[in-house]
């Protein structure tokens, strides 16, 4: 896929902020990420799903963080986890997609600040050099159902020590 093709996909994602999941172009993987908080249990969860053009799940991960986070913070950590997983597997052309407008907008901008959230965003951006192509796309909750379900599941698991 050419750079113009990826740009077309990015523009389509920006315009529609889709209500459903759309596959990435050929030779590109889509990495959906999500984060959720559970303040009553003082924990948060992260979910990542990497899919190909056919919608086949190539990799996924879920993590529990045993401390409370603001939503934007856990979403930022989920984005960093997503790119870390993609780097470890060796994907080079990716679309990072999440339902947090604040995180996706911050990733697209090139501003630098010293707030806790902006430092987390910089952590996500630090992975960019690992990819030949990296696009940021926003979806609505309905376009991120699988990843959101993964996060909700991991948050529902009781803490068990073995």
Where are each of the predicted segments found?
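Primary recognition of RNase H-like, Mg2+-dependent phosphodiesterase/nuclease domains
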Residues: 1-162
């Amino acid at each position: 896929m050419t750079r113009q093709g990826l740009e077309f996909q990015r523009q389509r994602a920006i315009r529609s902020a889709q209500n459903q999941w759309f596959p990435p172009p050929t030779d590109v993987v889509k990495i959906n990420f999500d984060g959720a908080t559970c303040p009553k249990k003082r924990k948060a969860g992260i979910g990542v799903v990497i899919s190909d053009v056919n919608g086949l799940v190539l990799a996924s991960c879920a993590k529990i963080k045993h401390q409370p986070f603001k939503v934007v913070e856990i979403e930022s950590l989920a984005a960093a986890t997503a790119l870390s997983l993609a780097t470890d597997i060796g994907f080079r052309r990716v679309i990072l997609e999440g339902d947090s407008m604040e995180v996706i907008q911050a990733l697209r901008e090139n501003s630098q600040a010293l707030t806790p959230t902006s430092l987390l965003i910089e952590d996500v951006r630090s992975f960019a050099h690992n990819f030949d192509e990296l696009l940021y796309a926003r979806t609505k909750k309905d376009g991120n159902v699988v990843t959101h379900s993964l996060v909700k599941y991991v948050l529902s698991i009781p803490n068990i020590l073995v």
